Amino acid sequence: MGKYFGTDGVRGEANVELTPELAFKLGRFGGYVLSQHETERPKVFVARDTRISGEMLESALIAGLLSVGIEVYKLGVLATPGVSYLVRTEKASAGVMISASHNPALDNGIKFFGNDGFKLADDQELEIEALLDAPEDTLPRPSAEGLGTLVDYPEGLRKYEKFLVTTGTDLSGMTVALDTANGAASVSARDVFLDLNAEIAVIGEKPNGLNINDGVGSTRPEQLQELVKETGADLGLAFDGDSDRLIAVDETGEIVDGDRIMFIIGKYLSEKGLLAHNTIVTTVMSNLGFHKALDKQGINKAITAVGDRYVVEEMRSSGYNLGGEQSGHVIIMDYNTTGDGQLTAIQLAKVMKETGKSLSELAAEVTIYPQKLVNIRVENSMKERAMEVPAIANIIAKMEDEMAGNGRILVRPSGTEPLLRVMAEAPTDAEVDYYVDTIADVVRTEIGCDN
């Protein structure tokens, strides 16, 4: 991560940290870096979610892009994966999404996609950051016919919706409850599932600029759970603010998280011989029950650091086509180059339809182990070196010996805060509490700030 770019673009409180001035510079410098080798006039797609700050940042960003001669196609409100899809299929130079994903309305973010539809590589982000920190803006300043042009492109939404529908199957006879988080999915999910002939019930579909992710969406699925039970829906589907992740709800109202969704889709693909290298890519945070279910099914796994960008990097480098995170980011590389909540939802419904099984039946093959996570405040200088402290290393080894393979411990530093995260999974809540609390006590004693 750089000074401005985190693991998912540039984020901050809108108009305070992520200002119009910064958005203009990101448009100008980002557009230049991503299009400097183009032989024809570069084309860049720009979309946003439903936050009140979106139009302000969109206007500033577009002004920056136009100032370096770029032809901008304004998509309006669209899911993040829709930008990625359109960049690839319409052969654009780049795409930009204005969103802070599952964060509250006061935040916003800007993330770039290259002409291949993937998020930027570290070296591209560093090149943009170098221009942001340069003492003087020395980029070209074209005038007259050298300036960029702006094209409103509402048909981009229709093209993305049609693409989604082509990946699915007829859902006649199925009732689907949707929670579009008052976000980007609110302009598309209803139409897509109606086109697939599902009966639908929808909440979180009335964005007002301030209510994105507010008590709704993938991080707050409680209302969706109630809607599923009230309507007798076959499944519920909750997206986040920019619709790049999905959390599902089965017909009994129980949550089906990203681990279980990946397993269900992965098993289906594996049985059809369509799971590349018979492998699913996941992160260190995936539940032990997920790993055991994969082992039982004979499916391999590749494990990365936390963050969908690391999952995608591993998928690209090794030729895998399915990966994701417990949080609901699922990447199905056969269809798109980034996490796509609506695409994942369609594939999940397709598995249900083609197998004739309920979501609870499909999800029951993964027994989720109780999990507990404790954050301990430590000095930044120590969080990366915690495992070098003998007492900490010894207590972790002791707890792992006691687990005898029927549990899991993960101790890792936070990527953004002076915290050490202690996580454990075990068959019972009591065992999880014991393992986490025992390790956490030693960490606090040895290197904790509050000790």
UniProtKB/Swiss-Prot annotation:
The keyword Nucleotide-binding belongs to this UniProt entry's keyword annotation: no
Q: Which GO terms describe its cellular component?
A: cytosol
- The EC designation for this entry is 5.4.2.10
Write out the residues that bind Mg(2+). 101, 240, 242, 244
Q: Which GO molecular function terms does the record list? A: magnesium ion binding; phosphoglucosamine mutase activity; phosphomannomutase activity
Q: Which biological process terms from the Gene Ontology are attached to this UniProt entry?
A: carbohydrate metabolic process; peptidoglycan biosynthetic process; UDP-N-acetylglucosamine biosynthetic process
Taxonomy, superkingdom: Bacteria
Where is the PTM Phosphoserine found along the chain? 101
Key words, A-Z? Isomerase, Magnesium, Metal-binding, Phosphoprotein
Q: Which family does it belong to?
A: Belongs to the phosphohexose mutase family.
Annotated function: Catalyzes the conversion of glucosamine-6-phosphate to glucosamine-1-phosphate.
Q: What is this protein called?
A: Phosphoglucosamine mutase
* Naturally occurring in which organism (per UniProt): Streptococcus pyogenes serotype M1
Q: Name the gene for this chain.
A: glmM
